[in-house]
Amino acid sequence: VLDLAGSLTPRLSELLDDCGAQTQVTTLWAYWRMRQRIEQYQDNLLMLGHSGYLAVMRRSLLYTLRTFKVAFSESQVDEFMLAYQQLDPFDDAVAGLERLAGSCRLVMLSNGEHSYLVHLARNRIKIRFDEIISVESVGQFKPDPAVYRHAARRLDLEPGQLMMVAAHSFDILGARASGYRGDYI
């Protein structure tokens, strides 16, 4: 639903410019996204507990900036992280959700913290979801099967009655492995 690249890469480009970095924003973005997954998987596999989505995004950004030898200050990173509060939905996502709302329950199942998800739903997506489920109640990140089992129990549905629709293949793989139907968009 949310356009992370479209929302964050302009701000990331500004950060790189402010730091005098010569790195291409697309290169840094791709590496940062890969590092985010590694950080989430480490939390899951090493049973480190749920660090929290925004904490993982920050930790992976710091790792990426250091890897690319970008000279930055903590205040610059703090300023950049505020962009996560201003994520924009894809142009067609809201219209699609509005069309679906009349015929099925809309449930947000996300790696983000619950309060953060409520903020995004109310202020950025501006759609009323029937349920907002955060992985923080499970203590694992998607695609851990426990996340999908928890959501099915909370919704009082069998996994086969649910469909995960996502723009990330790992969401679909985890959902399907847990008995959900999945659709990659």
Predicted stretch roles:
Residues 109, 140, 164-165:
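Conserved SAM-binding loop
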Residues 75-123, 132-135:
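Substrate-recognition element of Asp-dependent hydrolases with the DxDx(T/V) motif
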Residues 160-185:
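Acidic, Mg2+-coordinating phosphoryl-transfer loop and its flanking beta/alpha structural elements
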Residues 142-156, 173:
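Short loop-to-alpha-helix "cap/lid" segments that border enzyme active sites
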Residues 73, 127-131, 159-162:
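Short acidic capping loops at alpha-helix termini that bridge into adjacent secondary structure
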Residues 1-91:
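N-terminal helical cap/lid subdomain that shapes the substrate entry/recognition surface
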Residues 105-107, 130, 161, 181:
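Structural signature of beta-strand start/N-cap positions in the alpha/beta core
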Residues 29, 33, 128-139:
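A short, structured active-site edge motif that brings together acidic residues
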